[in-house]
Amino acid sequence: MLPNTGKLAGCTLFITGASRGIGKAIALKAARDGANIVVAAKTAEAHPKLPGTIYTAASEIEAAGGKALPCIVDVRDENQISAAVEKAVDAFGGIDILVNNASAISLTNTLETSMKKVDLMMGINTRGTYLTSKICIPYLKKSKVAHILNLSPPLNLNPMWFKNHCAYTIAKYGMSMCALGMSEEYKGEIAVNALWPKTAIHTAAMDMLGGSGVDKQCRKPDIMADAAYAILTKTKDFTGNFVIDEELLQQEGIKDLDVYAISPGHPLLPDFFLDESPETLASAMEEHGATAAFKAGKKQAKSQDASPLQETFKAIERSVNEEAVKSTQGIYQFVLSGEESGNWFLDLKNDKGGVGKGEPSTKADVVMSMDSGDFIKMFAGKMKPTMAFMSGKLKIKGDMGLALKLEKILGQMNAKL
């Protein structure tokens, strides 16, 4: 991991969304230098599903060697941001660094994204980043080490990253455009950069999106904290950059990236918005011996009369049991096109579960549409549902949480085949 150098000692960092996850990891890294941290987040009381509050984060920061100022801040609320900034200036004498980490996500298509969700993502991601930056800039301009760091992706205009979750992409790219515009506007005064992970990072949000078991395919928030530290300890002329965490750390001399993995050696889930297509990344993983997440099960003897699709559903049926039903509680409908078009369902909700052709007896919780050939590959472990979705080969309607559970279900099924 990247060692601390002490360069942030005495600096004041205003970090949004710092009560947990990546924001807290960045705060703790800076705290080890003896930095002052403003924990600007909404969670003041313990959440039933998400760990941490602004106060527990503050305690950890102080235990790590820093000073902490917990502030209740919803980045959509101008008054709350202004009040927190004033408290920070009163407590620490100014603000040197702003980290715009707070973010909201909904991986849903246009018709399935309510305007409430659109407003939430635009309000937190784009407007919140712009507003917090605007309020902090007068103080940042007085600092000799002024930085703004937005946790947002490179501006990749490949339509693949828009078509399945247009609203989320617009909201995240809004953060990136803030970095692009403000870096030029304040060149020489404030360094402004964006940071994005190469792979999925294990956070509470990722657990909610991917369900249990997704952690093995993720890296720890520490990799983003180290990359952020590397950026924030550079001079002001390092500005206007869209940085990828692992690429920067390799430039900084970090050779062993496995130390950041939750399960070292396990294949990693690529993050959104990067140039490599999901299929290219999957191929690269396989070339380097990463087989665990793409494991094809033991081959079954095929019936001479059964088609590949029928064989696939027979194999699925053999894996359905009460345990799978109890842990999943969902009905999947598959609308298949191509060589073997038709509707099939997987019931992991009622009684002992079941598989069949046509539509389920009760309404499906998730409807997945894709080519029958790709469906066969997906259930053979040769194509991950996440990658199929990201590349546009899989379209999803309904409960996204249940849809993301399918990856774990497939892994369990393939292990039994």
UniProtKB/Swiss-Prot annotation:
Gene Ontology molecular-function annotations: oxidoreductase activity
Active site: residue positions: 168 (proton acceptor)
EC number: 1.-.-.-
Subcellular location: Peroxisome; Mitochondrion
InterPro entries: HSDL2, NAD(P)-bd_dom_sf, SCP2_sterol-bd_dom, SCP2_sterol-bd_dom_sf, SDR_fam
UniProt keywords, alphabetically: Mitochondrion, NADP, Oxidoreductase, Peroxisome
Signal peptide positions (record): none
Gene Ontology CC annotation, any one: peroxisome
Short name of one Pfam family: SCP2
CDD domains associated with the record: HSDL2_SDR_c
Primary site of residence: other
Function: Has apparently no steroid dehydrogenase activity. Might act as a metabolic regulator that affects systemic adaptation to nutritional cues.
Protein name per its UniProtKB record: Hydroxysteroid dehydrogenase-like protein 2
Species assigned in the record: Xenopus laevis
